[in-house]
Amino acid sequence: MEPDVSIETLSIIRIAVLPIGTIPPTLLRDYHSMLLRHHTIALSAISSFYTEHQKSPFTNQPWDSGSLRFKFVLGGSPPSPWEDFQSNRKMLAVIGLCHCPSSPDLDSVTEKFNVACKSYSSALVRRCFAFSPGDSQLEDGDKKGENLILFPPSDKQTQEFHLQTMMQDIAASLLMEFEKWVLQAESAGTILKTPLDSQASLNSEEVIKAKKRRLGRAQKTIGDYSLLAGSPVDANAHYSTALELARLTGDYFWYAGALEGSVCALLVDRMGQRDVALEDEVRYRYTNVILHYRKSFIQEIAQRVSPLSFELEATLKLARFLCRRELAKEVVELLTNAADGAKSLIDASDRLILYVEVARLFGALGYQRKAAFFCRQVAQLYLQQDNRLAAISAMQVLSMTTDAYRIQSRASMSKVSVNNETGRLPDAGKMHHHSIVSLFESHWSTLQMVVLREILLSAVRAGDPLAAWSAAARLLRWHYPLITPSGQNGLANSLANSADRLPSGTRCADPALPFVRLFSFPLHSSQVDIVKRNPAREDWWTGSAPSGPFIYTPFSKGDANESSKQELIWVVGEPVQVLVELANPCCFDLRIDSIYLSAHSSNFDAFPVSVDIPPNSAKVITLSGIPTAVGPVTIPGCTVHCFGVITEHVFRDVDNLLLGAAQGLVFSDPFRSCGSAKLRHVFVPNISVAPPLPLLVANVVGGDGAIILYEGEIREVCINFANAGTVPIVQAHVSLSGKNQDAVISIADEALQSALPLKPGAQVTLPVTLKAWHVGPTDSDNTMSSGRNAAGNTGRPKDGTSPSLLIHYAGPLSNNGDSQEKESIVPPGRRLVVPLQICVLQGLSFVKARLLSMEIPAHVSDNLRDEDIERESNADSLVKINPFRGSWGLRFLELELSNPTDVVFEISVFVQLENSAKEDDSSPVQDSPEYEYPKTRIDRDYSARVLIPLEHFKLPVLDGSFFTKDPPPGSPSSSRNPSFSEKNTKAEINTLIKNLISKIKVRWQSGRNSSGELDIKDAIQTALQTTVMDVLLPDPLTFGFRLVRNGLEKDPETKAESPFSKGSVLSHEVTPMEVLVRNNTSEAIKLNLSVTCRDVAGQNCTEGADATVLWAGALSGISMEVAPLQEARHCFSLFFLVPGEYTMVAAAVIEDANNVLRARAGTASPNEPIFCRGPPFHVCVAGGAL
């Protein structure tokens, strides 16, 4: 059998192409490719070379449309024993190829060519083409005869034209030789034999039969030459005669041959005119051809020679003619019959050729798996031969089956598929189901393993270590679950042995172990966060920070690609990191010599690392690199140097594998089998590289640990900033973010601004003043326990509670000063987030707070004018005399504090003093605006009370607006707005309370460096809630006493020397006095006044027989009316009989009290009298002259 046969093969002239002398392989391929372009020579093109010596036997030669067809057999082939049966099997011409510079002796070339031609006795034309001859060779070439054709050095186009001319000459010579042979065969006849003819002596009957068959065989052979000469009509005429003679003589074998020739003549005659009728005719005739080949089977010589190969060859020719998808069923039946007949073939080479042709035809039909099956049969026949060339052939044939079995090497994939794998398409993040199914089909695993083992075996025999490594890698990577531990170790040894025979640094397209998947592309840390920069805005950082929490809306619709694809910016010269996970699901220790990121761009340098992975385990590693130039970067996978070979592991392949495992398309997930957790699909972001940027690095002076503060503690923290980049910082802005931003009291931003531009390597220190916030009740237990660490406070800040410093900074708009580049490309800015890791421990805790009151009686003295009060220093009047009551009213805020910590606190109370414009400039209060009370010490685990004195504030008037209650919602007055006076009064109350609270500060100190301030606002507010009326609202009536010194000089010097200047009273003298009654309301009050004088024992001194004080005037039953906000006086005189301490008390009963007075007094009945009593006034009576 012959390979690549078709029905038209009978019309093709075979020409042996032989290299003569030494020819470089590349030149030989070039010369051969030049010949292949002239496989068809039109008859019209050879008319100038054709000479008709006598009348041509090809009377129907189609000179206008006919052609001669050639098949160039490089290296020739041995003669076939079936050449007489089919003339196209003969080598009818020989062409020698010579390279003159390599073979300068043309005589030797001619001799070698003649010797080579002796092996082809059937050759009718012989030519030797000598290329690139020298000048001397050109002179000698003319003497060597017409068989040596010299091709002088020239351009390729000229050489091709020269070669075309020579091929036309060869075609004309062959045509003339065909005519000679046909004329001789018709006149003299010829003896034509095949191996089927008996070689034994023939009896007379067989001799007669042979003579009769000779004529029919001659006609068949003439028909073959007519067909080779391009005259299908003449060939068909001779074939018809041969068919008739062969049928009469029972020569079935030659009958089948003649019938085959007639079909070929029919197709050549109707070239390009294929239709259904033609197909039916060919099908019918070839069915007869196959039938007659089968009839020519001779049992006696079946063990030696058999026409079965021609029968199967005819079946293949018909199958090739009908091979298209519409007739697939018929073609498959023909091929199946041919494959079944292969078992009866005697020659193994015929069986090999048959399987090859069957595989080709199945592949042409699109039946790849059937084609792969017969390719494996071919490989088995090759592997039965124990030689290297057969192993190479087996390996090449098996490599053709890998596509059908889905085990193809990545090197054999088309460039288009590779681009689709690694290209950045809009749907590059998606994985399609059909692609996964095509890559992984678990029910074929056993067959895939067998094929890969056969490829591995053939590669080892062929001495191809790279192919052996590739096969072992694919077998181990994709089928490790089905391979025993010993088999896995064997494959690892095969990989190592193949690598030993390969040069160092060899790359293979097929990865082995480990399995590599993308774990994550870490986004920028807070140290290197990049912000887009708008050069048109000075505050380009505005809006760069997140404005609020993420809110999920299930009704929002968006593009999946837009949401899943991330944008990642790297910076030239700054190291970057990518996390990948490696899995070794096999039973041996895996040593990875190096692994690094694979970048399909020239602007990224990756850093290799070596890894050891134990058996059946996975490991997450960090791979790093440095971008080197601006532009996009693609990271499709990793480059791994393992088992002595460098391979590329693509993330997409492992993603498809894991998805296939999830859908049951592959046996096992290598990562799950190694104990790794299930990882969601990680999309590869779009990575771009920005130009060099400044890099600001921050660290807290004294350590980057948590800043431990007690509640209210104030501390200054210094943060050191350094420019670790290669570009200076020319712009910087500091802001705050996060919770508890009030904890940052001040930031010395001017220190940073003054250091700009901050050059590479330069540093600047930024002081930040912090104040610890109040720990909530939910955190009290945690802070209590953390505060117990006295020896070394190692408290941890609660996540999300500490504020952070945001530093937005940027370099110059252009690194090289190019204005065009400045306009087109603006380097981005950066945001540095410095978390202030503040751990607030509970310090002093409030137990309770209450308001205490105390009154100190005032001394009765001369007229108590305002200037007398103002004359006293502020330090002495921290607790002022109430001008409306005439005595000292004190309020104390008592705070009970507990110390649950392990440190000692000292508490100091500071009260802010009021600076009056009337004070003397030399007053010491000017230099000390705060008055400090003595310190209070609170030991650990103890409590203490701190008294904070409060001024007895009073409003100037008692008005009804203080007692106005909110009307019910349904009442008509509920819709009215409060009056302006009511709003004013309430606002005044709130202002006074806030003013009171703001004047008092409670500060603590612990040790040398720890100090702070307690937040007592809530405590004072709580304490004042129930007593706000008592503290702020004045009494309706206030009383006061004073001495009346009629005729006393008003001169200050005289007054200073008077014994009454300090309010002293002498006994046995009449002492004029007056009582002052002030109305603090906005309406007139009628009252009944009474005055009482008591001694130190509390007894009334003006009544009874034992009275010690005589009086003149009225002391009781005094009726008077006091105008609104005015004072009324009542004068009387006292005569003290006994020196000593006396107390004066005034009281009054208000007549016809209104609602405001009753609300202030809190009376329940409208008839109940309202009694007002004033505070006591002391009178110091000294002994006087009798």
From Swiss-Prot:
It is found in: Golgi apparatus, trans-Golgi network; Early endosome. This is Trafficking protein particle complex II-specific subunit 120 homolog. InterPro entries: TRAPP_II_complex_Trs120 (IPR013935). Signal peptide: none annotated. Expressed in roots, leaves, stems and flowers. Keywords: Endosome, Golgi apparatus, Phosphoprotein, Transport. Disruption phenotype: Cytokinesis-defective and seedling-lethal phenotype. Part of the multisubunit TRAPP (transport protein particle) II complex composed of BET3, BET5, TRS20, TRS23, TRS31, TRS33, TRS65, TRS85, TRS120 and TRS130. One of its GO terms (cellular component) is plasma membrane. Belongs to the TRS120 family. Residues 777-824, 964-984 are annotated as: Disordered. GO terms for biological process: cell plate assembly; cytokinesis by cell plate formation. The modification Phosphoserine is found at residue 971. Residues 972-981 have a biased composition (Low complexity). Specific subunit of the TRAPP II complex, a highly conserved vesicle tethering complex that is required for the proper transport of proteins in post-Golgi trafficking pathways to the growing cell plate in mitotic active cells. Required for the polarized and selective transport of PIN2 and probably PIN1 to the plasma membrane. Not required for ER-to-Golgi as well as biosynthetic and endocytic vacuolar transport.
